[in-house]
A protein has these predicted regions:
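Long, C-terminal-biased catalytic regions of enzyme "large/alpha" subunits
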Residues: 1-230
C-alpha cells in the first residue's frame, strides 16, 4: 500500500523567509528574494521527484505549520549561531513559505505572493491573512474571499473575537510582554490575566481554537507580532 502513489511521504519545510534573509538580507517578497525562494522550492521538489523515481514511493513538499518546533528551532539557531537580525532574533521561525508575520503588506498582495509557493507545496499548505472585526464591512470581506477563490489553493482569514469571563468584555484581549520576556494575556477592561477565565481564539497549527497554557512562548511571540493585512 506504500507504493505507486497510494501513500505520500512529506518533506516538510519552514523558515523560507529566514533562509532568504540569511543569504541575501532581503524578504522573499522582494524581486530578488522571491527569485531565490523559488529556486529553493524548486530544488526541494526536484529532490522529491528524484526520490520518487529511486524508491517508487510518493514524496511531496509540505508547508509545515511548525507549532512546537518553532520555539525549539529558534532557540537552537540562537544557540548555534548567536543572534542574527531578521533571521533568529525572535523566538519563533516563520511557518513554511509565509510572509513574515511582522511585515507590513496588504491582504491581496500577501495572498498573491504566497500563491506561487502554494503551487510548489503539493503535500499541503495554507495561507492566512489577519483581519479586524469585519461585521460592519462584509462587502470588503467578500472581495477577499473572491480573491482567494481565484488565486489560492487554500487560505483563511484570522479575526480576533475574545471574551473575558470575569467582566464580560467582548473584543480583543491584550498580549503583554513581561520583564522576563514572557507573554501573558490580559483583559483590557478589567485586567484579568488568568488564561482559564479568558476565552481567546487564535489560529494555531492551521486551525482556529481556544488559546490555553499549552501554547509555547515562541508561538505566543508570533501571535503578538502579527500585523493586520486589511
Amino acid at each position: 500500500i506504500m507504493y505507486n502513489g497510494y501513500a505520500t511521504i512529506s518533506l516538510g519545510y519552514a523558515g523560507l523567509y529566514e533562509t532568504v534573509q540569511a543569504l541575501i538580507h532581503q524578504s522573499h517578497t522582494t524581486d530578488d528574494g522571491r527569485e531565490l525562494a523559488l529556486q529553493i522550492m524548486n530544488k526541494l521538489n526536484a529532490y522529491c521527484e528524484k526520490w520518487k523515481k529511486e524508491t517508487n514511493l510518493a514524496f511531496s513538499v509540505y508547508g509545515t505549520p511548525m507549532e512546537s518546533g518553532t520555539y525549539k528551532f529558534a532557540k537552537a539557531l540562537q544557540r548555534d549561531f548567536d543572534v542574527v537580525p531578521e533571521v533568529n532574533e525572535h523566538d519563533y521561525i516563520t511557518n513554511s513559505y509565509h510572509v513574515n508575520v511582522r511585515e507590513e503588506i496588504d491582504a491581496f498582495d500577501k495572498l498573491s505572493k504566497e500563491s506561487e509557493f502554494q503551487e510548489l507545496s503539493s503535500g499541503g499548505s495554507i495561507s492566512y491573512i489577519e483581519i479586524p472585526n469585519m461585521e460592519k464591512n462584509i462587502p470588503a470581506l467578500l472581495e477577499v474571499i473572491k480573491f482567494i477563490y481565484d488565486n489560492n489553493m487554500y487560505a483563511e482569514c484570522n479575526t480576533r473575537n475574545d471574551v473575558c469571563d470575569t467582566c464580560g468584555f467582548h473584543g480583543e484581549m491584550e498580549m503583554v510582554k513581561q520583564e522576563d520576556g514572557t507573554y501573558v494575556w490580559r483583559c483590557p477592561n478589567c485586567g484579568e490575566t488568568n488564561i482559564n477565565k479568558l476565552e481567546i481564539v487564535r489560529r494555531v497549527c492551521g486551525y482556529l481554537g481556544r488559546i490555553s497554557n499549552g501554547v509555547n512562548q515562541g508561538r505566543l511571540g508570533d501571535i503578538h507580532d502579527r500585523v493586520f493585512h486589511l
